[in-house]
């Protein structure tokens, strides 16, 4: 299969590199229908939009054509060109990712020729845009004079450019088809290689499964028992460690509570001492005043009792 692939690529590249002699073209009136472009890939559809837009410009009347060429046609063709080349590049990169391992020399040659075909297509589209821009400049230069000669020259140039564009687009299409075939073949080889590598592993897995199935129920039960016992012992150890950790935390809390109780007791005693130091002098002073008052009352009563008998005599 690999030999057929290499032969196909070499044959196609040799045919694409052959010199193509330009054929004389029949005179075609401006605006006459010319073949469209069809394809299913995104880049082919983008090129078809460029092709259809250029054909639509060709079918316009002279006055409308001149007005459009002076404003929007060049810009819209530029957008369509960029879109086409972007899709071509994306499709080529996608194929390069899918391309399997082939001969290094053949792969490099295919890639080089494909890039050259892509560059020729871009050059053809750029020539179309440049020719339309030149026609617009020449129309503006004649300042209202007859433009029949200019339109004739434009039609002749566009016929040649259309033919070259179609030829290079078909060339690129063929090369991408070859590239695509190589990518599919590479994918198939990759799947086969993976299958070959997985085969021994699958056989080994089936053999291991058979070995496990042949073990006695007692051996498997013993294995599960050992595993379960180890798990229970592990859980018991974890539980003991957790309980020890809780006990240590409770001891720390109790020590902190006792420490805080001692601090509160010391603070209460200090506060009591401060209260005593505040009120003790006041109490002593009140006691002295009370003793003096009692003494004065007693003295007054004694004086009153001695003076009363004297008055009776």
From Swiss-Prot:
Give a Gene Ontology cellular component term annotated to this protein: extracellular space
Q: Which UniProt keywords apply?
A: Chylomicron, Endosome, Extracellular matrix, HDL, Heparin-binding, Lipid transport, Lipid-binding, Phosphoprotein, Repeat, Secreted, Signal, Transport, VLDL
- LDL and other lipoprotein receptors binding: region residues: 157-167
Could you tell me one molecular function GO term of this UniProt entry? heparan sulfate proteoglycan binding
List the source organism: Balaenoptera acutorostrata scammoni
In residue numbers, the region (Specificity for association with VLDL) covers 274-286
The name this protein carries in UniProt is Apolipoprotein E
The subcellular location is: Secreted; Secreted, Extracellular space; Secreted, Extracellular space, Extracellular matrix; Extracellular vesicle
Post-translation changes: APOE exists as multiple glycosylated and sialylated glycoforms within cells and in plasma. The extent of glycosylation and sialylation are tissue and context specific. Glycated in plasma VLDL.
Q: Which family does it belong to?
A: Belongs to the apolipoprotein A1/A4/E family.
Q: Which segments carry the region annotation Lipid-binding and lipoprotein association? A: 209-286
Which InterPro entries does this one have? ApoA_E, Apolipoprotein_A1/A4/E
Homooligomerization, as annotated region: 262-313
Chain intervals for the UniProt region annotation (8 X 22 AA approximate tandem repeats): 79-251
Q: What is its main location?
A: secreted
Q: Where are the sequence repeats?
A: 79-100, 101-122, 123-144, 145-166, 167-188, 189-209, 210-229, 230-251
Its biological purpose is as follows: APOE is an apolipoprotein, a protein associating with lipid particles, that mainly functions in lipoprotein-mediated lipid transport between organs via the plasma and interstitial fluids. APOE is a core component of plasma lipoproteins and is involved in their production, conversion and clearance. Apolipoproteins are amphipathic molecules that interact both with lipids of the lipoprotein particle core and the aqueous environment of the plasma.
State whether it acts alone or in a complex, and with which partners, per the record: Homotetramer. May interact with ABCA1; functionally associated with ABCA1 in the biogenesis of HDLs. May interact with APP/A4 amyloid-beta peptide; the interaction is extremely stable in vitro but its physiological significance is unclear. May interact with MAPT. May interact with MAP2. In the cerebrospinal fluid, interacts with secreted SORL1. Interacts with PMEL; this allows the loading of PMEL luminal fragment on ILVs to induce fibril nucleation.
Give the signal sequence positions: 1-18
- Residues recorded as binding heparin, renumbered to this chain, are 161-164, 225-232
* One record GO biological process: chylomicron remnant clearance
- Keyword Lyase, does the record have it? no
Q: Which Gene3D superfamilies match?
A: Apolipoprotein
A single Pfam family, by name?
Apolipoprotein
């Amino acid at each position: 299969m690999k030999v057929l692939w290499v032969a196909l690529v070499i044959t196609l590249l040799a045919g694409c590199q052959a010199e193509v002699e330009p054929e004389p073209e029949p005179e075609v009136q401006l605006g006459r229908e010319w073949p469209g472009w069809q394809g299913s890939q995104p880049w082919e559809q983008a090129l078809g939009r460029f092709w259809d837009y250029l054909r639509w410009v060709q079918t316009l009347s002279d006055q409308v054509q001149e007005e459009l060429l002076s404003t929007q046609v060049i810009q819209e063709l530029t957008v369509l060109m960029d879109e086409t080349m972007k899709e071509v590049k994306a499709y080529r990169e996608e194929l390069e990712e899918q391309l399997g391992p082939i001969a290094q020399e053949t792969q490099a040659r295919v890639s080089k020729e494909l890039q050259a075909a892509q560059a020729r297509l871009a050059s053809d589209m750029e020539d179309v845009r440049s020719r339309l821009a030149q026609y617009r400049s020449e129309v503006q230069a004649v300042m209202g004079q007859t433009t029949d000669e200019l339109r004739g020259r434009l039609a002749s140039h566009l016929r040649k450019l259309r033919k070259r564009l179609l030829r290079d687009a078909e060339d690129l299409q063929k090369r991408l088809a070859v590239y695509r075939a190589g990518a599919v073949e590479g994918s198939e080889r990759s799947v086969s290689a993976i299958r070959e590598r997985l085969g021994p592993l699958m056989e080994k897995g089936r053999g291991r499964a058979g070995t496990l199935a042949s073990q006695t129920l007692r051996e498997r039960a013993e294995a599960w028992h050992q595993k379960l016992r180890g798990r229970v012992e592990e859980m018991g150890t974890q539980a003991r460690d957790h309980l020890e950790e809780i006990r240590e935390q409770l001891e720390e809390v109790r020590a902190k509570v006792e420490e805080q109780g001692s601090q509160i007791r010391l603070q209460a005693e200090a506060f009591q001492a401060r209260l005593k130091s505040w009120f003790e002098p006041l109490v002593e002073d009140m006691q002295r005043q009370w003793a003096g008052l009692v003494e004065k009352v007693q003295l007054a009563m004694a004086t009153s009792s001695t003076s009363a008998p004297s008055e009776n005599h």
